[in-house]
Amino acid sequence: MSDQVIIFDTTLRDGEQALSASLTVKEKLQIAYALERLGVDVIEAGFPVSSPGDFESVKTIAQHIKNSRICGLSRAVAKDIDAAAEALKVAEAFRIHTFISTSTVHVQDKLRRSYDDVVEMGVKAVKHARKYTDDVEFSCEDAGRTPIDNLCRMVEAAIDAGANTINIPDTVGYTVPGEFGGIVQTLFNRVPNIDKAIISVHCHDDLGMSVANSIAAVQAGARQVEGTINGIGERAGNCSLEEIAMILKTRSEYLGVHTNLKHDEIHRTSKLVSQLCNMPIQSNKAIVGANAFSHSSGIHQDGMLKNKNTYEIMTPESIGLKNQALNLTSRSGRAAVKSHMDEMGYKEDEYNLDTLYADFVKLADRKGQVFDYDLEALMHFANLRDEDDFYKLNYLSVQSGSVMATTSIKLLCGDEEKCEAAVGNGPVDALYQCIYKLTGYDIVLDKFDLTAKGEGEDGLGQADIIANYKGRKYHGTGLATDIIEASGQALLHVINSIHRADQIAEIKQKKVETV
């Protein structure tokens, strides 16, 4: 048996299901690039048949990612598999992941089929997927609650049909480590053709057991672990891949396995996912939380000063968290900014230095010192910015009292600059009234969040909104030292997305009319 554990990331598929609004194609591609840098073996980019947006995202990622295998999810249905194959065919290497429910409650109450029918459907799906690729993964949904005899039967049939990866999901996070490890061990003991496939596990965190269950499965012989960055996912989330990575690295002698991950990419990958998904990382989160390497107890601090090994089982540097000795100021040149980006591991083709430096100078003039985390935030937002944004904020002035606020803005609408002033219940409300008047969009805000992206009173603030327009949800984000400006950027992000969608719909309609 191989001692390498394959890392299968499903942040862009299972993880995204936890978000209030879908990520854009550009945001998903940024995350995919980060996962590729991290050394993830397989990236599950989406569920192509579920929507045109998901299909386009999977196709785009398949076109651009070269060093990770791209995977698309499908039900055990021919049209799903066909859609996945169509989206993935441009990839250097791809996998089709098909699944069907196998637990008694799912088979009887959801599928309303006999178990014989379910096995037949699974076999047909695997055989159909093999027409497109020799890399097929088959999942037994809700395997954790599936009678073991039925599970063994399904696994054997799927392998015979051509599946070379068999995934055993604890779909509702029901099992405990000894139990889940026992399920995997039983498969190895009872399925005669088990040596022809890699056993994978996909654990959810409803009882807080996802990481522990995954490790128990690895000890029982599983050689692929599925999960997400920061453990994001439906309900209580998924298995945290950064935790799996550092467990397998830190306890490699005991567990006897390894991964191909570049562990020093963990920190920035985690930050990127948190930022783009607008899901803050709790301070005490293992591996990537702000307090993960903090020591406040006097006894602990004394031990750390004498020998870090007294209380530190891994170093901040091992996940790419480095202390910054030199801060940047408005007097720092382009070379200094580039040097900091180089030290953080960013390549020149991952960002536009001219754009980044221009944004850096503006920020440095406002806050004095600029830190590495500021540069990262500026880079991520610059990468998301579209040059063809129709609406751009040129000027903002706020007057706020104890009761009401007045905001004046100048908004560039295409080539025309328009001015507006409004009174509102606070500066953000007044600003939004101005933008609504000038753009004419009737938008309903479902969610509004402000988070700090740096340290100190002059740190960057990020505004994230979820907006509803004509029944469709949009996610907008803005970044600035001024939270009012950041809030305006977030709303304009949404409105520009709506404007582009309207333009595309208009072009399509004209084509239909022409035909």
From Swiss-Prot:
Binding of Mn(2+), residues: 14, 202, 204, 238
The reaction(s) this protein catalyses: 3-methyl-2-oxobutanoate + acetyl-CoA + H2O = (2S)-2-isopropylmalate + CoA + H(+)
Protein's name according to its UniProt entry: 2-isopropylmalate synthase
Similarity field: Belongs to the alpha-IPM synthase/homocitrate synthase family. LeuA type 1 subfamily.
Gene: leuA
GO BP annotations, alphabetical order: L-leucine biosynthetic process
Organism (species): Aliivibrio fischeri (strain ATCC 700601 / ES114)
Pathway it works in: Amino-acid biosynthesis; L-leucine biosynthesis; L-leucine from 3-methyl-2-oxobutanoate: step 1/4
Predominant location category: cytoplasm
Keyword vocabulary terms for this entry: Amino-acid biosynthesis, Branched-chain amino acid biosynthesis, Cytoplasm, Leucine biosynthesis, Manganese, Metal-binding, Transferase
